[in-house]
Design a protein with these regions (language model features):
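Class I (Rossmann-like) S-adenosyl-L-methionine-dependent methyltransferase catalytic domain
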Residues: 1-103, 142-217
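Local beta-strand N-terminus motif with an aromatic residue
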Residues: 36, 108-109
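Residue-level detection of beta-strand scaffold positions
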Residues: 57, 109-110, 133
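Short, charge-rich binding segments
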Residues: 102-104, 134-135
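A conserved beta-strand element that flanks and buttresses the S-adenosyl-L-methionine
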Residues: 112-115
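A short His-aromatic
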Residues: 118-122
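A short glycine-rich, Lys/Arg-flanked "PGG" loop and its adjoining helix->strand segment in the class I
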Residues: 127-139
Length: 217
């Protein structure tokens, strides 16, 4: 999606990482999850975790902005749009745009939202994502929200302009935003949007927050 922030255009779709750069820890978490059935990859990007999800769950929905879904790019070594790639590689999988999220009639046992909030420079859109997660979860479903908040790579952002949870960085070609969302920040956002915290922890510079719709201690 494109965001206009103080006269600067930020294209969040450019933040998506390829399947060659997964978190091995998150891959293992998905594989060992006690959840099964139906899953949603909320902010699927370049299908970084698609193989892990389709191997684990009976049906998977991949969701991202219409701009991300419709552009031709290299997806797992294939030049295609995301819907084209999914149609030719995965059974029992479908694709929905963020803009059409309200048309989804299913609810999900598991929702993955990995490195999505950190790419959004707009609080109202972040709230829209979290509200969408709550709406699409089953009553006993769980969502895993992951954000990287510490890395030497981020040092360059700190010379940029402070904005929301992070910084806007400009070079000669484009502008980008990265939010540094630790456990506390993510939990606060989720609680503000009526999600319950099931668990949270940090590992190797990333925050992991598991949320649900029910009451949890």
């Amino acid at each position: 999606m494109n965001y206009e922030i103080n006269g600067v255009t930020i294209r969040s779709e450019n933040a998506a990482k390829p399947h060659t750069m997964p978190s091995n820890y998150l891959c293992g978490y998905i594989k060992e999850s006690i959840k099964n059935g139906r899953a949603l990859d909320f902010g699927c990007g370049k299908l970084r975790y698609s193989e892990q999800l389709v191997d684990k769950f009976d049906a998977v929905t991949f969701l991202d902005s219409r701009k991300q879904l419709e552009r031709v790019q290299i997806i797992r070594g294939v030049k295609a749009t995301i819907p084209e790639y999914i149609a030719s590689h995965y059974e029992n999988a479908d694709v929905v745009s963020f803009e059409d999220m309200n048309q989804i009639t299913n609810n999900y046992d598991f929702i993955l939202c990995a490195n999505v909030l950190s790419a959004i420079p707009c609080k109202s859109t972040i709230d829209q994502v979290i509200c969408g997660i709550r709406k699409l979860l089953k009553s006993d479903g769980e969502a895993m929200i992951v954000n990287q908040y510490k890395c030497s790579y981020f040092k360059r952002y700190e010379i940029g302009v402070k904005h929301l949870y992070g910084y806007i960085y400009q070079n000669s070609h484009n502008s980008s935003y990265y939010g540094l969302l630790d456990e506390g920040v993510v939990k606060k956002i989720c609680i503000e949007n009526n999600l319950s915290i099931i668990g949270s922890w940090s590992k190797a510079g990333s925050s992991y927050v598991v949320v649900g719709k029910g009451k949890h201690i």
